[in-house]
Curated annotation (Swiss-Prot):
GO terms for cellular component: cytoplasm; nucleus. This is Gametogenetin-binding protein 2. May be involved in spermatogenesis. Residues 555-575 are annotated as: Disordered. GO terms for biological process: cell differentiation; spermatogenesis. Keywords: Cytoplasm, Developmental protein, Differentiation, Spermatogenesis. The keyword Cytoplasm applies. It is found in: Cytoplasm. It comes from Gallus gallus.
Length: 698
């Protein structure tokens, strides 16, 4: 803590202040000299961090002497700007501004090693500027105490004022150790000056005391006479009851009108002890009937006056010490910032930019990690898709293009067996496991690969079961879900010479794309057209049935074999899953006496079916539906059922007795062909394995 070392008797303007000394104004009659000890700012006795000190020395050596001189100079505006931002107490801010102005005017080295110039420029002494170690201690040891000091100051919650600048501080408090603290910080000269009591000041304190305790007139007069004896205006020998021992240690100067009090600490403590009940509080009526009692009242007032003076000095000392510390630490902080800015200017990069670069680098690393994760997930999905479709898409498309070209060349030639120009290799192999299972065919992407290929059935194609129950007994009409007919190869029996042929009479233009194959392959197209053309297609179905009955003769065998009554004629009714009713007639004839074996017929048909067998493979890349999807979609119910009369069923069964006799043989062959189809397409449709097991079980 600062000490009071001297008294400015001739005025503070004439006093030779040394380093770290400032004047302390007590009252109109007293001004003391306040000094901060050297150990407060010891720049050599601190143990510094070796790494940080080495780094600071390197930065200090980077600056030239001229740049260092400029960096070690800050204006008053910078210091006071930091003051307004950091110090909330109004009294502290005003005290700092006042002290800085006094130092600018006087030029005293009060802030050593800081120096205040006449133009308000704050700088550092040359000895400290050239010594990097001292400068480091000043900036990073003492300069770091600014925030701690400001935070340690108690503040009022109402107006943010500190206790030293609060209005309550000026009121006298009960006696404590504060007077002893300030008494020990004073030099002997200061103590002698403190105990020199002015007579007029003591009289004011005495009158206040008499009014406060409501002395009567006689007692009041007694106290005033005791005061006059003390200052030497009355002769004490003429006063009856006067006690000279009470005024021992007190000496008056009548010419100068002041009183000298003994400087011994015990005597001061005795005087202040008399005044202690007064500061404890309470007003009471007092009396002084005799002179000795009046002398004690005068000593009490002397103790009150002395205590108030010591309390005022203690308060001024603490406030000025706090003001000096604030100004010193604010100046050090401003100089440190100026030095760091100069070093950063030389380095070309600031600490803030370094921090921003660190944040940017962290952000880049984070984004890189996220990008790697996204790429990893993308590769995982890609590998999963490759595993599901092992055949490359481009190879499949090239194969489909080649097959489409072959189909186009083949369909240009007419069917030699029956003279029809319909496509002979578009028959679809389907096995119907039970009456509730709907037929399914490959997607339209491969089946109808070229727009020039006609849509229709094979000339060797006949329907199996035609949507009826497999049993001879109890044949019932099937619903729309179960009446989807699978156009399969080799149902019809033909001669070896190919005389018996099935001519497909359905006109493409008239049917508007409703052929047998299209009811399987173009199920999505018929979905979009079904609602708009429902009535039109119903009429087309009836028309197609009538044409089939009238043109039944064209489906007969050659004339030599027509005498037999075993002619077989069956009609296939194809019903779409999307409630579009398609009626296709496909007829075949066989001789009851001379029927070709089933395997011979399949041998002939396979010559046409094998070249384009790969073209029937569904194209998974073009949105075609698999066999399972088509079968699942065929499960939908239909609000409109197309029934076949019982007479037609009985007539069909009577005319096709030979078909029913060879029924198991036909079924076995269909299973073999379907198994062969699934094996050929097993690499594209792994799900066919499940259908193979299901078909075998059924």
């Amino acid at each position: 803590m600062a000490r009071l070392v001297a008294v400015c008797r001739d005025g503070e303007e004439e006093f030779p202040f040394e380093k770290r000394q400032i004047p302390l104004y007590i009252d109109d009659t007293l001004t003391m000299v306040m000094e901060f000890p050297d150990n407060v700012l010891n720049l050599d006795g601190h143990q510094n961090n070796g790494a940080q000190l080495k780094q600071f020395i390197q930065r200090h050596s980077m600056l030239k002497q001229q740049d260092l001189n400029i960096a070690m100079m800050v204006t008053s505006r910078e210091v006071l700007s930091a003051l307004s931002q950091l110090v909330p107490c109004v009294g502290c801010r005003r005290s700092v501004e006042r002290l800085f102005s006094q130092l600018v005017e006087s030029g005293n080295p009060a802030l050593e090693p800081l120096a205040v110039g006449p133009k308000g420029v704050l700088s550092v002494t040359r000895s400290c500027m050239t010594d990097a170690k001292k400068l480091y201690t000043l900036f990073y040891v003492h300069g770091s105490k600014l925030n701690d000091m400001i935070d340690a100051i108690p503040k009022s919650k109402k107006n943010k004022r500190c206790q030293l600048h609060s209005l309550d501080t000026h009121k006298p408090k009960p006696l404590g150790g504060c007077w002893m603290d300030v008494w020990e910080l004073m030099s002997q000269e200061c103590r002698d000056e403190v105990v020199l009591i002015d007579s007029s000041c003591l009289l004011e304190t005495l009158e206040t005391y008499l009014r406060k305790h409501r002395f009567c007139t006689d007692c009041k007069n007694k106290v005033l006479r005791a005061y006059n004896i003390l200052i030497g205006e009355l002769d004490c020998s003429k006063e009856k009851g006067y006690c000279a021992a009470l005024y021992e240690g007190l000496r008056c100067c009548p010419h100068e009108r002041h009183i000298h009090v003994c400087c011994e600490t015990d005597f001061i403590a005795h005087l202040l002890g008399r005044a202690e009940p007064e500061f404890a509080g309470g007003r009471r009526e007092r009396h002084a009937k005799t002179i000795d009692i009046a002398q004690e009242e005068v000593l009490t007032c002397l103790g009150i006056h002395l205590y108030e003076r010591l309390h005022r000095i203690w308060q001024k000392l603490r406030a000025e010490e706090q003001t000096w510390q604030m100004l010193f630490y604010l100046g050090v902080d401003a100089l440190r910032k100026s030095f760091e800015m100069a070093v950063e200017k030389v380095q070309g990069i600031s600490r803030l930019e370094q921090l921003c670069e660190e944040f940017s680098e962290e952000e880049r690393v984070r984004e890189l990690k996220q990008e790697k994760k996204r790429q990893k997930r993308k590769n995982r999905r890609k590998n999963k898709c490759v595993c599901e479709i092992p055949t490359p898409l481009q190879a499949a498309e090239e194969k489909e293009i080649n097959q489409a070209k072959e189909n186009l060349d083949f369909t240009e030639n007419s069917c030699k067996a029956c003279g029809s120009t319909e496509e002979a290799n578009n028959c679809v192999e389907v096995i119907v496991t039970n009456e509730s299972t709907s037929c399914t065919c490959p997607s339209s992407g491969t089946l109808l690969g070229s727009p020039k290929i006609k849509k229709g059935l094979s000339p060797h194609c006949n329907g199996s079961d035609c949507g009826y129950s497999s049993s001879m007994e109890g044949s019932e009409t099937g619903s729309r879900e179960g009446s989807d007919v699978a156009c399969t190869e080799g149902i019809c029996n033909h001669d070896e010479n190919g005389d018996d042929s099935c001519v497909h009479r359905c006109d493409d233009k008239e049917e508007d794309g409703d052929s047998c194959v299209e009811c399987w392959a173009n199920s999505e197209e018929s979905n979009t057209k079904g609602k708009n053309k429902k009535k039109k297609k119903k009429s087309k179905t009836l028309k197609c049935e009538n044409e089939h009955i009238q043109k039944l003769g064209s489906c007969m065998a050659d004339p030599g074999n027509r005498e037999t009554s075993g002619n077989t004629t069956h009609t296939e009714f194809h019903r779409d899953k999307t409630k579009d009713t398609h009626a296709e007639s496909c007829c075949s004839s066989e001789k009851s006496g001379q029927q070709l074996p089933w395997f011979e017929h399949m041998k002939n048909v396979s010559q046409f079916a094998e070249p384009t067998e790969m073209s029937l493979v569904p194209d998974t890349g073009k949105g075609a539906k698999s066999l399972v999807e088509l079968l699942d979609e065929s499960e939908c119910t239909s609000d409109e059922e197309i029934f076949i009369s019982q007479d037609e069923i009985q007539s069909f069964m009577a005319n096709n007795k030979s078909f029913y006799s060879n029924r198991e043989q036909y079924r076995q062959h269909l299973k073999e062909k379907f198994n062969k189809y699934c094996r050929l397409n097993d690499h594209k449709r792994p799900i066919c394995n499940g259908w193979l097991t299901t078909a075998g079980a059924n």
